[in-house]
Amino acid sequence: ASLKKSLFLVLFLGLVSLSICEEEKRENEDEENQEDDEQSEMRRGLWSKIKEAAKTAGKMAMGFVNDMVGEQ
């Protein structure tokens, strides 16, 4: 009977430990996904700024070329 109780206790503690590990694993995965989302958002913001800068530079270059062509 005591062997049965000991075995039950070991199995119970093992399941509790496994459950805690699974919960921590899920939390870590959620944190990683959130970090990935934040990095993606930062990249999108950076790319939009780069595109805006490129548009502005292109407009300025076209204006400069038009001015140079107009002077000749």
From Swiss-Prot:
Its main location: secreted. Residues 22-44 form a propeptide. Belongs to the frog skin active peptide (FSAP) family. Dermaseptin subfamily. The keyword Lipoprotein does not apply. Residues 29-39 have a biased composition (Acidic residues). It holds the Pfam family FSAP_sig_propep. It comes from Phyllomedusa sauvagei. One of its GO terms (cellular component) is other organism cell membrane. Antibacterial peptide with activity against Gram-positive and Gram-negative bacteria. May also be active against fungi. Expressed by the skin glands. Residues 23-44 are annotated as: Disordered. This is Dermaseptin-S12.
